[in-house]
Amino acid sequence: MRTPLLPLARSVLLLLVLGSGHYAAALELNDPSSGKGESLSGDHSAGGLELSVGREVSTISEMPSGSELSTGDYDYSEEYDNEPQISGYIIDDSVRVEQVIKPKKNKTEGEKSTEKPKRKKKGGKNGKGRRNKKKKNPCTAKFQNFCIHGECRYIENLEVVTCNCHQDYFGERCGEKSMKTHSEDDKDLSKIAVVAVTIFVSAIILAAIGIGIVITVHLWKRYFREYEGETEERRRLRQENGTVHAIA
C-alpha cells in the first residue's frame, strides 16, 4: 500500500518547493532596500526566470528524497543548522519587523539600585535617654499602702507587686495573722512538767524495785527459819526413837 503513495508525495513536495521559491524570488525583486530589486524590477525577464529556476533547483537538491522520508533516516537538524539566522521577520512587502534589543544596564547603575538606603536611627539622643530612664516604682506611688503588715516589693521582670510579710503574718496584703496555741512560758512549763513526771515515775519504779527486794529477802529468811525448825524436830525425833529402842 505504501508504493503508490511515494510518487504522490514527491509531486506534492515539488509543488510546494516551486511555490516557495517563486514567492521568495518575488519578495527579493520587490524589496526596495536591496540593489538587485532595481535591476530586476518590472516584468519577469529571462534572467529573472533563470534566477528563480536556479533557486528552485537548489531547493529541490536540498530537499530529502522519498526513500529517506519513507525510512525516516533523514536528519532535519543539519538542515536547520545550515539555514542563516534572520534578525527580523518580514510580514509584508512594505512592512518589516525587527527584534528589539534591550539596552544593557551599566554596572554602576546596578550597584546603586542594589544598595539599600540606610535607615536613620529613631530617637537619637532622646531615644538613648528614654532607654536609660528607669521605670517608676509603683510601690512608692500607687501601691504605697498596699501591704498592711509588710514591705512592698516590685519585680521588674514580671511587672508584679508583692508583699514581704512580717513575722506571724501572711496573705496577699499581709493582713492575716497566724494564731499560736502555746507561748514561750507555756513551753517552759510543759518542759518542767515532763521532767517532773519522768522523775516521779522513775522514783516509783525504784521504790517498787526496793520493796520487791525487801519482800524477797524477808520471805527467804522465813523459809530458811522454817526449814531449820523442821530439821531440829527430825533430829529430836530420831534421838527419842533411839533411846526407846535402847531401853527395850
From Swiss-Prot:
Instruction: Supply the residue numbers of the propeptide(s) excised during maturation.
Output: 27-99
Q: Where is the signal peptide?
A: 1-26
Q: Which InterPro entries match?
A: EGF-like_dom
Set out the biological process GO terms recorded for this chain's protein. dichotomous subdivision of terminal units involved in mammary gland duct morphogenesis; epidermal growth factor receptor signaling pathway; epithelial cell proliferation involved in mammary gland duct elongation; ERBB2-EGFR signaling pathway; G protein-coupled receptor signaling pathway; glial cell proliferation; mammary gland alveolus development; mammary gland branching involved in thelarche
Disulfide pairs?
139-152, 147-163, 165-174
Instruction: List the GO cellular component terms.
Output: cell surface; cytoplasm; extracellular space; membrane; nucleus
Compositional bias (Basic and acidic residues) at which positions? 100-116
Q: Which residues form the EGF-like domain?
A: 135-175
Glycosylation positions?
Answer: 106, 241
Q: Which SUPFAM superfamilies match?
A: EGF/Laminin
Q: Which UniProt keywords apply?
A: Cytokine, Disulfide bond, EGF-like domain, Glycoprotein, Growth factor, Membrane, Signal, Transmembrane, Transmembrane helix
| Superkingdom per UniProt | Eukaryota
Q: Does the keyword Transmembrane helix apply?
A: yes
Major place of localization? membrane
Annotated segments matching region Disordered: 29-48, 57-77, 100-136
Q: Where is the composition biased (Basic residues)?
A: 117-136
> Could you tell me where the Polar residues compositional bias lies?
58-70
GO molecular function list: cytokine activity; epidermal growth factor receptor binding; growth factor activity; receptor ligand activity; transmembrane receptor protein tyrosine kinase activator activity
Give the way it sits in the membrane.
Single-pass membrane protein
Is Membrane included in the keywords of this UniProt record? Answer: yes
The entry's localization annotation reads: Membrane
What do we know about what induces or represses this protein's expression? Answer: Androgen-dependent.
Q: Locate the transmembrane regions by residue number.
A: 192-215
Quaternary structure annotation from Swiss-Prot or TrEMBL: The immature precursor interacts with CNIH.
The record's comment on protein family reads:
Belongs to the amphiregulin family.
Q: Know the name of this protein?
A: Amphiregulin
| Protein source organism | Mus musculus (Mouse)
Q: Which gene encodes it?
A: Areg
